[in-house]
Amino acid sequence: MARLFVVVALLALAVGTVFAADAPSAAPTASPTKSPTKAPAAAPKSSAAAPKASSPVAEEPTPEDDYSAASPSDSAEAPTVSSPPAPTPEADGPSSDGPSSDGPAAAESPKSGATTNVKLSIAGTVAAAGFFIFSL
């Protein structure tokens, strides 16, 4: 009974490792073809432009502090989140002697299901070897 438990545990571990290796990483990876996207730096505030505490301007609520809108979707001036613009092929410049831009580059080629099938075959082989070893 203990052998069966060990074999099933090895099989589960092998299959789990295969699928964990195919899962995307939680950490973002830097793409060598794209420029890094950083948030724009805020302009430094000068002390002359900042209102003083005794100034009547400082006591009035600013438009950012106005919470009269029920929700951001009700306000027409609500900030929206947008993705950075997609890179255009013209931005890199046309390359007459390079590979054509019709298909993905070698570094950008999508993974096929064949990789997963090979890994599952290896996991099955490990499981079969485990069954054989622990059945002796």
Swiss-Prot record:
List the record's Gene Ontology CC terms alphabetically.
plasma membrane; side of membrane
Please tell me where this protein is predominantly located. membrane
Signal peptide feature range = 1-20
- Keywords, A to Z? Cell membrane, Glycoprotein, GPI-anchor, Lipoprotein, Membrane, Proteoglycan, Signal
**Highest taxon of source:** Eukaryota
Q: Which PANTHER family did the record assign?
A: CLASSICAL ARABINOGALACTAN PROTEIN 11, CLASSICAL ARABINOGALACTAN PROTEIN 9
Indicate the family of this protein.
Belongs to the classical AGP family.
Its name, as the record gives it, is Classical arabinogalactan protein 11
Which source organism? Answer: Arabidopsis thaliana (Mouse-ear cress)
Q: Which gene encodes it?
A: AGP11
